[in-house]
Amino acid sequence: MKWYFYWALRQLFPAGRPFSFFALVSILGVALGVMVLLIVQSVMNGFVHDIRDSLARTNGDVRVFSSALLDDWREVAADLREREEVEAVTPFAQGIVMVQEGPRPLFPQVWGMDPATGPEVLPVDSFLVAGSLEDLDDRSVFVSTGVANRLGVGIGSDLDVYTPLMLERMKEEEVLLPLDLRVAGIFETGWNEVDRSTILVTLRTLQELYGLGDRVHGLTLRLADPEKAPVFARTLDAELPEPLFARSWMDLNEDFLFVLRLEK
């Protein structure tokens, strides 16, 4: 018998003495500590899994960006759809706007989605807590639960939307009317950063707001095997011509995922 086992047993069960209270406390203390550790680890693993799932669902598996506005995005999207790893592709544009309902202004992130191809890549319909995906058109908006609560709006409410371009022109004493959008849906993704301050409009609406013309900021991809997103993104990134580059959802949230690993 190893010497440390021998001394441990001698301390727990001294020769010639009955089972001691201290031995019982020691054994139960270790058992309780291990049990608590297992429970905490199980809860954390479930928590991390839910967050990772929310991140993947709201970001898409892989995104293709451009260091400049993407003009020929239709050709790029068609080429990507030819790859066997890719199941669906949709364009996107994004920015920051000021929205106002009555006297209350808010500055949420705005996402522009193509209603035809967006739902093939992102499960927008499953995020909706009010409204229907068919209600999203060029004169309507979906708002996150955080935006709805902070502005006190619901289905049918009207929002005045201003972009930085509009605000800049207003400084030049130009009279510009805001874009009036009707709230057609309220969504919740489970990812606080999105749910706290995000609105969703059609791609055409965002292109109009930001003066993009037919250009977009990038493409979002859904893969046949989402688990291969990091590997596929690296491979695609090496093959794409400049100024295009690819990032997986894990790359885009690398810092946050690192913090989650530390928490575990």
Where are these regions (language model features)?
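N-terminal Sec/SRP start-transfer signal
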Residues: 1-34
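Alpha-helical membrane-interface segments at transmembrane helix boundaries
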Residues: 13, 29, 44, 48, ...
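Hydrophobic, regular-secondary-structure patches
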Residues: 35-109, 116-119, 125-137, 146
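Extracytoplasmic
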Residues: 57-59, 103-108, 119, 136-138, ...
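Soluble periplasmic/extracytoplasmic beta-strand elements of cell-envelope proteins
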Residues: 61-65, 90, 107-112, 142, ...
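Structural motif
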Residues: 62, 84-90, 151, 214, ...
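Hydrophobic secondary-structure segments that place a key small or acidic residue at a functional site
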Residues: 93, 130-203
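Mechanotransmission and gating elements of multispan inner-membrane complexes involved in transport
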Residues: 165-167, 174-264
